[in-house]
Amino acid sequence: RERIYVKGGVVSMNYTLNTIEEVLQDMKVGKPVIIVDDESRENEGDLIIAAEFATQENINFMVKYARGIVCTPMRREALEKFGIPAMVTKNTDNHETAFTVTVDHVDTTTGVSPAERAYTIQKLLDPSAKPQDFRRPGHVFPLVYKEGVVLVRQGHTEASIDLCRLAGLQEAAVICEIT
């Protein structure tokens, strides 16, 4: 089982793989899970939660223990609704990670705290949110996942969305590379 356990401020890890059913059960209740890819790809792991469980505590956990960039994979249509464009017109990233322009919700101050990043992510899921509700640039990194998900691109972005779908959750996640 590949789970991170935090008890009394002490982090311990158990390095066996979980079943998909165990991962989905954890995701359904907002627990972070780790997804690792193949040695022939990035050979790394990402902490993942379903975006609807983005809380100050979960974002802080990701920043503290994974230490990578906190990203939010979402549907292209959702990001287009908010007028959030691709970060670059020609993507030359080795793995073609589809970054968009970063955002903060207008009700945040600096946008960088775990609480404000969680708030921005929650607002990205809000069906009543409008383009003017988001400032650019910001501290939340939306990503566009490929339609067809892991059958088309074997990235953490797409794997996180597949897990959200299988868990019956919204098609949006929060991922953070473990560095």
Kindly label every feature range from the protein language model.
Residues 1-12:
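Short, Lys/Arg-enriched N-terminal segments with co-localized hydrophobic residues
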Residues 12-179:
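Catalytic domains of riboflavin
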